[in-house]
């Protein structure tokens, strides 16, 4: 491996306190929608980890939660379902 080769960090599953940040248009029910979608795949979601942040101009809202990630398949399913809502711009 050379100095220019960068490898993504390995995640060991299950991974407790795995952060998921979702950014979408601010609007009524956006945070509830995000939590609902994530809870389908991570029923043990602790709502006390929910963090909301408005963008500077108030147009966007970021919703961050911590889950216990059980595997890549779970994370991919969460991402796909969030994008399918049509209200999500980014999932980090």
From Swiss-Prot:
SUPFAM superfamilies: YbeD/HP0495-like
GO cellular component labels: cytosol
One Pfam family cited in the UniProt record for this chain: DUF493
Residues spanning the signal sequence: none
Family per record: Belongs to the UPF0250 family.
Record protein name field: UPF0250 protein Avin_08440
Organism, scientific name: Azotobacter vinelandii (strain DJ / ATCC BAA-1303)
